[in-house]
Every structure is written in C-alpha cells, then in structure tokens.
Design a protein with these regions (language model features):
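Glycine-rich flexible loops
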Residues: 1-181
Length: 181
C-alpha cells in the first residue's frame, strides 16, 4: 500500500473518531496528516463528516498550499500549510469547534490544560483568512496548541492519536474551567 493510500485510511479513521467525540460538527473543524516533507492530507471543504470517504481527503503541497483533484481542501488549509511548513516536528493537526472551547475562545484569555500546558489565544481574524493562518502560525512558534479567538482550538502533534487526545483533554478541561460538573 502506498503512503498516500495508508495516509487516506489513517486520516479517515481519525476524522470519524473526531466526529464521534463531538469535537467537530457537520462541516465545522478539520484534521490533517503530514504524508512526507512535501505533502499532507486534509479533510475537504463543505462536506459533512457523516458523508466523508477516504477518497474525499485532499492532498495539499506544503510549499505553496496548492491542492490536487476536484475536491477543495478545508477552508482552513492555509493555517495547516503554514504550521506544517514552519514546524517539521508536527505530523498531525486537529482543529476543533467543540462547545466548551467555543465559549472559552470568546473570552480570549490563555488557560492551563491539565497541570502544565498553557495554550495562548491568537489575535482575532475572520475565519478562513490568510491573516488567521498567520496569527495562529505565529503562536505555533512557541506552542503546540492555540485557542483561536472567537473561533475554536487547533493542536499539532507527532501523531493523529496524540493530537486527538490533546484536543479531547482540552475540551474536558475547558468544561472544568466553565464550572461543568
């Protein structure tokens, strides 16, 4: 099996897990996987996770953000491209729009997840813009996760499993901060 086929299979499995954990809804949120130094795969734009298939995952070139095929990549692919370009140690990215994080992102204050990890809040920019991608990429110079002001959360990790686990933990901790029992 080729690396592209393996990547499609793995990313598809984790995209379904991401949806099942309610960290994303409908077409909101996205997930990607670095294939090699030149390319990554990402979920498509405008396609509900319930309708997703491995063939709909989009291959994107890291150097310039160009994509291959007829299906458009997530509208936040600019953000993923900049993170992969600047952080060679990151192999997977999860961007969530989960309930508790949505609330906390509107407060625009950094917070602690677990006992040690602090996630900053990026400067506000409209979604799907180059400015949002630049603001998030700037925070990724020092952090592996960022709360996107009035938007959601994005985390980069060595694997899809690690990125999904961090995103899940962050949503739980956000609930604790909001006083959920």
């Amino acid at each position: 099996m080729s690396r592209l086929a393996e990547g499609r299979k793995e990313l598809f499995e984790y995209a379904l897990k991401l949806s099942e954990t309610k960290l994303v809804f409908g077409t909101w949120g996205n997930i990607s996987l670095r294939l090699c130094d030149k390319y990554y795969l990402i979920t498509p734009s405008g396609i509900d996770y319930k309708e997703l298939t491995p063939e709909l995952l989009v291959r994107v070139r890291i150097s310039d953000g160009a994509y291959f095929g007829d299906v458009k990549p997530s509208s936040e692919s600019k953000m993923h491209t900049l993170i992969y370009r600047n952080r060679k140690d990151i192999n997977a990215i999860v961007h969530t729009h989960s309930t508790n994080i949505q609330i906390l992102s509107s407060i625009r204050k950094p917070f602690i997840v677990g006992e040690k990890v602090i996630y900053p809040v990026s400067k506000y920019s409209p979604s799907s813009t180059k400015k949002l991608a630049l603001n998030v990429a700037k925070e990724f110079e020092q952090y592996n996760g960022v709360i996107i002001a009035n938007h959601g959360f994005v985390v980069g990790a060595k694997s899809l499993e690690e990125a999904l686990n961090i995103a899940s933990e962050t949503e739980i901790q956000a609930g604790v901060l909001l006083g959920e029992k």
